[in-house]
Regions:
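C-terminal membrane-solvent junction of multi-pass transporters and transport-like membrane proteins
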Residues: 10, 325-332, 375-426
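Membrane-interface loop-to-helix entry segments
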Residues: 132-183, 238-242, 373-376, 402-409, ...
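A generic transmembrane alpha-helix motif of multi-pass inner-membrane proteins
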Residues: 36, 368-370, 374, 401-490
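Membrane-helix boundary/coupling elements in multi-pass transport proteins
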Residues: 75, 98-113, 219-227, 283-323, ...
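TM-loop-TM module centered on a large, flexible mid-protein loop between adjacent transmembrane helices
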Residues: 81-83, 88, 120-125, 239-305, ...
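Membrane-interface "cap" regions at the ends of multi-pass membrane proteins
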Residues: 1-38, 42-47, 59-60, 64, ...
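Extracellular loop-to-transmembrane helix junctions
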Residues: 32-130, 241-251, 429-441
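Helix-loop-helix junctions that connect adjacent transmembrane segments
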Residues: 5-8, 48-49, 125-132, 160-291
Length: 490
């Protein structure tokens, strides 16, 4: 394959609408509702809507942090770069590594239900076959791997189709759920309060699961080097994406509480959305929502691949991981080595996952483990924003609230649920979550000893209004300067 270590990613491919779609797709509304509602109900019972509401507030603080940091440092590594340039390079690497590990785990956890749901469309009995689900899920994964390899333009076109159909289906079923008459329970405002949580630890467990619901909107920051007017667009798209998925999550979680009994939720597990569809539209509803979940799952596999490969690309470019990961294909302008490595590792994990139990068991532990890793890198990014903007926080009340208090609250919340949840999670989830982070210490210390320039960073300070884009080694600065202002929509 053609490649060049001096080439960068293709600039000016994505417009504003494209990045909003990517943010929504990254959070995978249909998949998150289907795969996680039973886990959330198991953690907090009827308080699922409250957990999503109270996690949305600090999550918006983290989205604000990403928005403000992306204005002063355009980098495909996102929090990996920002945290390294504000707090400490070691923390920056751990932040990037947390994303890489969580995304890799998700690619397995997400591909399994993609295979299961595909089989369910033809024969529901086959959906519980873990081995067959793994094979079909791996096939979907390879298709998305090829799409991501083909470039950002192909990626966003595929995403517009998949997410467009998914959101249209969800909108129709949201209306059907609102007007459904034969309900298991009447709506209760207490579901949005604290009374249904089992103490502080119960709230923390629910919030950790809720963090998994929202995770993925930050793919816009990993695409910043390929986005038009990225200093404004990526952060705005992330904020809009969080708002859209919050509304969808609340509507469907409340609908599940109202329409389905606790026994139905427990019985259906990762197929809870199909059960809801069957209740509101008997005969066809379940099948149609399975299609929505399948599209959502495949779509978020694509955005997750983007996040992990762009993060590894930035690490390879900085030589904090093998420099080959920073190679870009001459024709497609994608980090083809990083994509190939991720594909190979994921396929090995697909095979290993067959020894871990059923699809439902794998999902439950994976979601909790990913939640721990999400809390780490989101929390560090929130702190990084406060440090980067510390000299400007007292300029106005808006600067203090949006640049300091809210991101700081978001960071504190993420670290709190991380600590509180450790004692509540299953041992397998803790081992996967913490063990995955610990493995990152090996490459971090190795490349630090090798003298990577990443560990001697230029400090990120918003008061100096850093305007220069990231310029890879060997790439002219004038080329990077053209990152903004060109027509990119198609």
């Amino acid at each position: 394959m053609s490649n060049s270590t001096g080439r960068g990613l293709q600039a000016n491919v994505l417009g504003t609408f494209d990045t909003v779609v990517m943010a929504v797709a990254g959070s995978a509304p249909a998949y998150s509702i289907a795969a996680t509602t039973a886990v959330l109900a198991g953690a907090v019972g009827l308080a699922g809507p409250a957990a999503l509401l109270y996690c949305a507030i600090p999550m918006l603080g983290i989205a604000l942090a990403f928005s403000r940091l992306s204005r002063i440092d355009v980098n495909a590594g996102a929090s990996y770069s920002w945290v390294g340039r504000t707090l400490h390079p070691f923390l920056g690497f751990i932040s990037g590594w947390a994303l890489v590990i969580s995304a890799t785990i998700f690619m397995v956890a997400g591909s399994l239900p993609a295979g299961s749901m595909t089989l369910a469309l033809f024969d529901e009995g086959l959906a519980d076959n873990t081995a067959l689900s793994t094979v079909v899920g791996a096939a979907w994964f390879l298709v998305m791997l090829a799409v991501v390899l083909g470039g950002a333009r192909l990626t966003v076109r595929a995403q517009l189709i998949m997410s467009g159909v998914e959101l249209a289906i969800l909108a129709v079923f949201a209306v059907l759920a609102v007007f459904h008459a034969d309900n298991s329970l009447p709506f209760d405002w207490s579901w949005l309060g604290f009374s249904h949580f089992d103490g502080v630890s119960g709230f923390a467990s629910g919030a950790l699961v809720a963090a998994f619901y929202y995770w993925g909107w930050d793919v816009t920051s990993n695409l910043s080097e390929e986005t038009r007017d990225s200093r404004r667009t990526t952060g705005l798209a992330g904020l809009i994406g969080v708002g859209i998925v919050f509304l969808l999550f609340e509507v469907f979680t409340i609908a599940v509480n109202v329409i389905l009994s606790s026994q139905q939720i427990e019985k259906n597990g990762a197929n809870v959305l199909a059960a809801l569809g069957e209740e509101v539209w008997p005969g066809w509803g379940g099948k149609v929502l399975v299609v929505a979940v399948l599209l959502s799952t495949v779509a978020t596999l694509e955005t997750t691949l983007i996040q992990v490969t762009r993060s590894l690309f930035a690490m390879g470019r900085d030589r904090t991981m093998p420099s080959a990961l920073g190679r870009v294909h001459r024709t497609w302008n994608t980090p083809w080595v990083a994509i190939a490595v991720v594909g190979g590792v994921a396929l090995v994990l697909f095979v290993a996952s067959n020894a871990l139990g059923s699809v439902g068991d794998i999902l439950a532990d994976a979601i909790s483990a990913i939640g721990l890793q999400i809390a780490v890198y989101y929390g560090l990014a929130g702190l990084a924003a406060v440090v980067a903007y510390r000299k400007t926080l007292l300029k106005s009340p808006a600067d203090f609230l949006l640049g300091g208090l809210w991101p700081l609250f978001g960071a504190a919340f993420m670290f709190w649920i991380f600590v509180e949840s450790l004692g509540e999670l299953a041992p397998a989830a803790v081992v996967i979550g913490i063990g995955g982070l610990a493995v990152g210490l090996v490459p971090m210390l190795w490349y630090w000893r090798q003298g990577s320039d990443y560990y001697r960073p230029a400090r990120l300070d918003a008061s100096r209004t850093v305007e220069a884009d990231y310029v890879p080694v060997g790439r002219p600065a004038t080329h990077a300067a053209g990152h903004e202002g060109l027509s990119t929509d198609f």
